[in-house]
């Protein structure tokens, strides 16, 4: 009960602080955006791959970095559904890249472009070193996480707590920009408890802009850093699209991508009247077939929309290769469970790919049986 009372106070504070939104000087300079098609070959990227300069990725529609979800297998599946969506890795900490198995964290197949690496860290030198590694792996963008509210990352000065240290974030961005030629972007909240006024948000964005960042993905909620789980921080603080919209008005020269609570392509089209791009998180994972019409509705593609059964059929060779290399089918199929969402047999589909697949001597046969449930759809 004490937590609920404290949260209510924080939310009221947010509303009060943001009721009157001051304006900052406007700058009408715009930055061009390009749509880039992914490569079609299936080579696996490693740090032995030379840097491959690419046009800046288009951020009109992207899938958010999500821990335990947007791994390389998930991204391969999502790329089958949409050629133009910008995909993000899970957040990878600087310590993991510099002192762990770098290739395990960063390798991917070349079909996944356009692809961005999200980094977690707050040491400018370490972030610069990791950005160089990302460039060697031919990532199209490096993104700094300034939005994750979990206690675990806060203890290492990672994530949303950095909104309380805009000068440090600016130093981190500058160090990365000085180290690489690929774009460096930031994903952040509209504030944190104790630093949730619009003036403070503008101060944060302004300082990071001066460090050279030109693209900001804004999760339109504050983060409450004590007493709430990451899941609660995605739901309890209210969405404030108006604050993000004001930010775009006051910083027209910056690319502002909206994140938070977006569930349909109709929502996307509406928000694109105000913002430069939209980013979907949980909805894109739980209902992945939503991506199947992104290219047509948001990028003007005239290619036919892929069916659910076609997507699963195209995923089969990837799964077979992964299994042949010693992996398990569940590494891949766990990301496909939402493909039958809304159809009769959806529960059976999920059971076959999450339970039955472990019991059968030929798991690919179970995959083929599951495919019959969505055949022609």
Model feature map: region roles:
Residues 93-98, 121-124, 147-162, 222-227:
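Conserved radical SAM core fold
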Residues 89, 141-150, 213-222, 280-283:
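Non-cysteine beta-strand/loop elements that form the S-adenosyl-L-methionine
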Residues 35-62, 67, 73, 171-174, ...:
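Alpha/beta catalytic cores of nucleotide-metabolism and tRNA/nucleoside-modifying enzymes
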Residues 44-51, 55, 66-140:
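Glycine-rich, positively charged N-terminal anion/phosphate-binding segment
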Residues 151-168, 198-199, 227-240, 301-302:
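Glycine-rich tight-turn/loop motif centered on a GG-T
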Residues 63, 78, 90, 117, ...:
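Conserved, mostly hydrophobic/aromatic
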Residues 5, 11-15:
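Intrinsically disordered, low-complexity segments enriched in serine/proline and basic residues
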Residues 22-25, 29-32:
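Compositionally biased, intrinsically disordered low-complexity segments enriched in Pro/Arg/Gln/His
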